[in-house]
Amino acid sequence: MSTESMIRDVELAEEALPRKTAGPQGSRRCWFLSLFSFLLVAGATTLFCLLHFGVIGPQREEFPKDPSLISPLAQAVRSSSRTPSDKPVVHVVANPQAEGQLQWLNRRANALLANGVELTDNQLVVPSEGLYLIYSQVLFKGQGCPSNHVLLTHTISRIAVSYQTKVNLLSAIKSPCQRETPEGAEAKPWYEPIYLGGVFQLEKGDRLSAEINLPDYLDFAESGQVYFGIIAL
């Protein structure tokens, strides 16, 4: 709102006030009203000028140029954001062309194999000791339910360097069928995902595998549905 508009509104407000007979109280009231109107217009004009010329307004946060004045935590956050991570990480995906088996590939879109992790004999080889997040997902698909009960399993196993024995780290079992599809009835499709994930202490040279029991039920219709990976913490 401009200053001229504010002055015009004040004048119209004064004209709208009822006229009273002149007297000591009426003169004093008119004097106070005029003084208030003047102060209101002057204050609004001053505020408008200060905002227009940028004298007041939102302040920008400024960081000190001297690094010693920045907190150690802030320095660590800023330096880590500029330094690439050297922690082992891998994300492999299933090969949709491998019929009857679950084969992992790292040379595919959205796959990753970095900082020492190896994919050997369909197993992930841990490059260094430490805590790791291990995860995997598979998606099963079928048409109708057969007479024999369908049990789907997904397991992540570890073969440690210290003892050459396969040990299950994570495992899950699901059954997509509650009852057999009646003869002559429509065989409806079903989908059953299984996700596994957990944090484990691993040693250098440990081998990890992600396996299933019924690979013929795997669904490769869309990418990113079947994967396996580890992330060093």
From Swiss-Prot:
Positions on the Cytoplasmic side per record topology: 1-35
Domain THD: 88-233
Record CDD domains: TNF (cd00184)
Glycan-modified residues: 80
Membrane-topology annotation of the record: Single-pass type II membrane protein
One protein family per Pfam: TNF
Record PTM: The soluble form derives from the membrane form by proteolytic processing. The membrane-bound form is further proteolytically processed by SPPL2A or SPPL2B through regulated intramembrane proteolysis producing TNF intracellular domains (ICD1 and ICD2) released in the cytosol and TNF C-domain 1 and C-domain 2 secreted into the extracellular space. The membrane form, but not the soluble form, is phosphorylated on serine residues. Dephosphorylation of the membrane form occurs by binding to soluble TNFRSF1A/TNFR1.
Subcellular location(s) per record: Cell membrane
Record-level GO cellular component terms: cell surface; extracellular space; plasma membrane
Broad class of the protein's primary localization: membrane
GO terms under biological process: extrinsic apoptotic signaling pathway via death domain receptors; immune response; necroptotic signaling pathway; negative regulation of protein-containing complex disassembly; positive regulation of apoptotic process; positive regulation of canonical NF-kappaB signal transduction; positive regulation of extrinsic apoptotic signaling pathway; positive regulation of JUN kinase activity
Taxonomic superkingdom: Eukaryota
Secretion signal span: none
Record-listed Phosphoserine modification sites: 2
Feature type site, description Cleavage: 34-35, 39-40, 49-52, 76-77
InterPro entries cross-referenced by the UniProt entry: TNF, TNF_alpha, TNF_CS, TNF_dom, Tumour_necrosis_fac-like_dom
The entry's keywords: Cell membrane, Cytokine, Disulfide bond, Glycoprotein, Lipoprotein, Membrane, Myristate, Phosphoprotein, Secreted, Signal-anchor, Transmembrane, Transmembrane helix
Lipidation (N6-myristoyl lysine): 20
Subunit structure: Homotrimer. Interacts with SPPL2B.
Membership in a protein family: Belongs to the tumor necrosis factor family.
Function: Cytokine that binds to TNFRSF1A/TNFR1 and TNFRSF1B/TNFBR. It is mainly secreted by macrophages and can induce cell death of certain tumor cell lines. It is potent pyrogen causing fever by direct action or by stimulation of interleukin-1 secretion and is implicated in the induction of cachexia, Under certain conditions it can stimulate cell proliferation and induce cell differentiation. Induces insulin resistance in adipocytes via inhibition of insulin-induced IRS1 tyrosine phosphorylation and insulin-induced glucose uptake. The TNF intracellular domain (ICD) form induces IL12 production in dendritic cells.
Stated name of the protein: Tumor necrosis factor
